[in-house]
């Protein structure tokens, strides 16, 4: 059912997710274990639908939270933004624990690593605030790749909405 989610539209994805949830719930209620090796293998295949992989991760986390936590360590550069966000959050949580123990030497590299892997704007801003609190300000403009300086090398005539269509000699 998880593989069937590859290439499915949103409507079909919702139906397939409900089917997977029903099957998993029935198996767990009957006392049967979920096939963790197959779920982990599916989760590692990044070519599958990100929502299907997220569902596989949730099933692993439901039955074996320790394994799910171990899997997150390898997902800092995952193409699935939801899984990547969880992996980054794990690093941020570790950094928060280090800060609580007044150990900024450990926290700063964790936050730097989290910042390099983060893609969620609110998460990036939160990490930047924590780094600023540790005396390591982050240039968010540079981090996001915004152009802040440029040079105009010639005129640009846009009278009458000519724009780019005009050819200059």
Model-derived regions: residue spans:
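Structural detector for internal amphipathic alpha-helices that build alpha-solenoid repeat scaffolds
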Residues: 3, 11-30, 41-44, 51-65, ...
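N-terminal small/polar loop signature for handling phosphorylated ligands or for N-terminal nucleophile
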Residues: 7
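Charged/polar interaction segments and conserved charged motifs
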Residues: 10, 50, 165-169
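Alpha-helical repeat scaffolds
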Residues: 33-43, 106-111, 141-147
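Accessory carbohydrate-binding/adhesion or oligomerization-edge regions at the termini
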Residues: 116-169
């Amino acid at each position: 059912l998880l593989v069937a989610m590859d290439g499915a539209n949103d409507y079909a994805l919702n139906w397939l997710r409900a089917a997977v949830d029903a099957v998993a719930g029935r198996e767990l209620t009957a006392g049967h274990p979920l096939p963790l090796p197959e779920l982990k293998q599916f989760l590692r295949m990044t070519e599958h639908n990100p929502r299907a992989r997220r569902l596989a991760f949730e099933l692993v986390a439901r039955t074996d939270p320790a394994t799910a936590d171990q899997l997150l360590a390898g997902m800092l550069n995952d193409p699935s933004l939801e899984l990547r966000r969880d992996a980054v959050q794990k690093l941020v949580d570790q950094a928060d624990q280090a800060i609580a123990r007044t150990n900024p030497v450990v926290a700063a590299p964790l936050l730097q690593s989290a910042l390099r892997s983060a893609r969620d704007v609110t998460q990036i801003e939160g990490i930047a605030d924590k780094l600023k609190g540790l005396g390591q300000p982050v240039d968010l403009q540079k981090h996001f790749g915004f152009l802040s300086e440029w040079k105009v090398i010639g005129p640009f005539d846009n009278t009458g909405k000519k724009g780019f269509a005009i050819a200059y000699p």
